[in-house]
Amino acid sequence: MARTAFLGLGVMGYPMAGHLAAAGHQVTVYNRTTAKAQAWCDTHKGDHATTPAKAAEGAEFVMSCVGNDDDLRSVCLGPDGAFAGMSPGAIFVDHTTVSSAVTRELHQAAAEKGIGFVDGPVSGGQAGAENGVLSIMCGGDAAHFDAALPVMEAYGRTVKRLGDSGAGQLTKMVNQICIAGLVQGLSEALNFADKAGLDGKAVVEVISGGAAGSWQMANRYETMIDDQFDHGFAVDWMRKDLGICLSTGDEIGAALPVTALVDQFYKDVQALGGGRWDTSSLIKRLRALG
């Protein structure tokens, strides 16, 4: 079993760190809100530290799941950052969805200290984290990925290396581009069914077994029909991710017209007060249009 640290105990990180402990790994956690870290320790076998650097001391693997590019830099760099506490040969695995640019920046900074760096954003949402069945798309040196794989398997069902540093983040963008179009299509379909006087749940039971079936349909259609959105992946975070997709698309010359449109639709949802609603709340925008 490995000596590990986990930085960031949000809705994803909290259960992910718990799976590490349940698998028998030694876990030290760090969270900006100390009470959250203490609560985690009260539930799981582990310790908590007051800085990322202290959490990382002696760890073979340091995992993070924080908010954005700046948050990731803050837990990695500087005298209190994880890199300052890590020993040469240790490996940092980042599960945050961030830009591929900051990933490559931190990969280089880690390499200069003799530290491995793997970008491993996740998909599967809060339920996937709680059940330990996340999909993890990774980028980085093959040797570092191979070393970290058994640890990531504590909370990941599908874990794959897609290429060098940044490849994991680019793959996560592909994932979010797919989801944006799927959720908008599902929203339009369910709204259409309602306007046509059909039983939406009965309709989905029929079509979900055919070509229209998807994870979004299977896991979100009932709550969408019932107007329940206090769960899942928040619109605010989806807009952050789509912003990364759109800026990267501009950089590499990839047109994303539907993604750009759906991003604006999510902006409309935010204006309705839905920043913390699940991404499936796109249907509320259609209902608001009448």
Residue ranges and their predicted role:
Residues T4, V66, V98-I177:
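Rossmann-fold dinucleotide-binding core
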Residues M12, M16, C65, M86, ...:
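Methionine-biased hydrophobic packing positions in alpha-helices, especially
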Residues P52-I115:
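Rossmann-fold NAD(P) dinucleotide-binding segment
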Residues A147, G166-L289:
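Helical "substrate-binding/catalytic lid" subdomain
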Residues V27, H48, G116-V118, V159, ...:
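Hydrophobic beta-strand scaffold residues
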Residues M1-S64, A90, H95-T96:
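NAD(P)+-binding Rossmann beta1-loop-alpha1 motif at the extreme N-terminus of oxidoreductases
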